[in-house]
From Swiss-Prot:
Core component of nucleosome. Nucleosomes wrap and compact DNA into chromatin, limiting DNA accessibility to the cellular machineries which require DNA as a template. Histones thereby play a central role in transcription regulation, DNA repair, DNA replication and chromosomal stability. DNA accessibility is regulated via a complex set of post-translational modifications of histones, also called histone code, and nucleosome remodeling. This is Histone H2B. It comes from Chaetomium globosum (strain ATCC 6205 / CBS 148.51 / DSM 1962 / NBRC 6347 / NRRL 1970). There is a cross-link at K131 (Glycyl lysine isopeptide (Lys-Gly) (interchain with G-Cter in ubiquitin)). Belongs to the histone H2B family.
């Protein structure tokens, strides 16, 4: 039996991945170890798509983004995070510390990002940490 037109959801402009929060990767496991044939759970991908989409709508409410562009931006964010984490890890090792603090993150951002971009990133990061600290008290 065909679904009625009233039962359908209206189409949205947001990409399918943008409506979901970053998802955790689940190793595909069977739900029952016995002989029952159960479907494996689908491995979930963690992405920054929903956050990128929210920022895009704050800056340009009438602009959309293609899945390919979203994938490129997601790769960019992952790459920058990996570079910052690697540099912060090296800084902690140089100083014979086993913990990465906000100071190592800040220094690694200054080393990785050029000039004015580093200054803005550090100020935004400081603002975010201050906001978080005040909200948890």
């Amino acid at each position: 039996m065909a679904p009625k037109a009233a039962d359908k959801k209206p189409a949205s402009k947001a990409p399918a991945t943008a409506s979901k929060a970053p998802e955790k990767k689940d190793a595909g496991k069977k739900t029952a170890p016995s002989g029952d044939k159960k479907k494996r759970t689908k491995a979930r991908k963690e992405t920054y798509s929903s956050y990128i989409y929210k920022v895009l709508k704050q800056v340009h409410p009438d602009t959309g983004i293609s899945n390919r562009a979203m994938s490129i931006l997601n790769s960019f964010v992952n790459d920058i995070f990996e570079r910052v984490a690697t540099e912060a890890s090296k800084l902690a090792a140089y100083n014979k510390k086993s913990t990465i603090s906000s100071r190592e993150i800040q220094t690694s951002v200054r080393l990785i990002l050029p000039g004015e971009l580093a200054k803005h990133a550090v100020s935004e990061g400081t603002k975010a940490v201050t906001k978080y600290s005040s909200s948890t008290k």
